[in-house]
Amino acid sequence: MRPRMKYSNSKISPAKCDSTSGRALVPPCKITRSQQKTKDICHVYCMRLRSGLTIRKETCYFGKEPAKRYSLKSGSKHEGRLSTCLPDSRKRSLLGSIQAFAASVDTLSIQGTSLLTESCALSTYNDQSVSFVLENGCYVINVEDCGKNQEKDKVLLRYYESSFPAQSGDGVDGKKLMVNMSPIKDTDIWLNANDKDYSVELQKGDVSPPDQAFFVLHKKSSDFVSFECKNLPGTYIGVKDNQLALVEENDESCNNIMFKLSKM
């Protein structure tokens, strides 16, 4: 008769098994939120128009910096790179923002929003300074010589996309650019083309500039541009007797309608 063998059904915990080899299980080291440093990451997208203007778009988000962690075995510290990638939803949002920015170049003129606003010094072909000066409560237009070391006054220019097709590469997406001009401190006052006496004057507006306050921008050379009246095709802002006036383009008055814009 064979003796009966007894088997134990008791379970040994994994920690006890591992202790037989001189090692104990330790929970993994986790990096707390306080250790996860964040940094501001910005992407800048620039679109350069054929007219030489550059439209700038900046998109920013927060990413995680690499954090220092300690090794369980050696106790030494080393850098581990935390994820700096955006979630898919954030990536889609960022991509959509870029696409909307690119598409906005075609739709801004429909919405009546300026593509770009900047302050520039406006000079004639003969390097005379054009300025809008407030005198006795009214703005006047001055065209005067300026010394070499004298700082030129600036005017405010807003750029728009027009409905006129570009023929000489001075537009964007086949359309010419338009501008209107204002004093720096009074943006509701616009330079207007008066078709009755062929003069140029500053007038206060209500909500949006009228057609006579828009001028189609033509790039004459790398340094000079001209301003054609939107409401009077073939008529430009020009200089007559040291004053701004409306001038029809011809060979004799070509230099009189050329102006230089400089940001200084």
From Swiss-Prot:
Family under the similarity heading: Belongs to the IL-1 family. Highly divergent.
Subcellular location(s) per record: Nucleus; Chromosome; Cytoplasm; Cytoplasmic vesicle, Secretory vesicle
Domain notes: The homeodomain-like HTH domain mediates nuclear localization and heterochromatin association.
Matches recorded under Gene3D superfamilies: 2.80.10.50
Interaction with RELA: annotated span: 66-108
UniProt keyword annotations, A-Z: Chromosome, Cytokine, Cytoplasm, Cytoplasmic vesicle, Nucleus, Secreted, Transcription
Region: Homeodomain-like HTH domain, residue numbers: 1-67
Main location: nucleus
Site (described: Cleavage): F101, A102, L108, S109
PANTHER family for the chain: DVS27 PROTEIN (PTHR21114), INTERLEUKIN-33 (PTHR21114:SF0)
One GO molecular-function entry: interleukin-33 receptor binding
The protein, known as: Interleukin-33
PTM info: The full-length protein can be released from cells and is able to signal via the IL1RL1/ST2 receptor. However, proteolytic processing by CELA1, CSTG/cathepsin G and ELANE/neutrophil elastase produces C-terminal peptides that are more active than the unprocessed full-length protein. May also be proteolytically processed by calpains. Proteolytic cleavage mediated by apoptotic caspases including CASP3 and CASP7 results in IL33 inactivation.
Single GO biological process annotation from the record: negative regulation of leukocyte migration
Task of the protein: Cytokine that binds to and signals through the IL1RL1/ST2 receptor which in turn activates NF-kappa-B and MAPK signaling pathways in target cells. Involved in the maturation of Th2 cells inducing the secretion of T-helper type 2-associated cytokines. Also involved in activation of mast cells, basophils, eosinophils and natural killer cells. Acts as a chemoattractant for Th2 cells, and may function as an 'alarmin', that amplifies immune responses during tissue injury. In quiescent endothelia the uncleaved form is constitutively and abundantly expressed, and acts as a chromatin-associated nuclear factor with transcriptional repressor properties, it may sequester nuclear NF-kappaB/RELA, lowering expression of its targets. This form is rapidely lost upon angiogenic or pro-inflammatory activation.
GO CC annotations, alphabetized: chromosome; cytoplasm; extracellular space; nucleus; transport vesicle
Keyword Mitochondrion: no
SUBUNIT field: Forms a 1:1:1 heterotrimeric complex with its primary high-affinity receptor IL1RL1 and the coreceptor IL1RAP. Interacts with cargo receptor TMED10; the interaction mediates the translocation from the cytoplasm into the ERGIC (endoplasmic reticulum-Golgi intermediate compartment) and thereby secretion.
Propeptide: 1-101
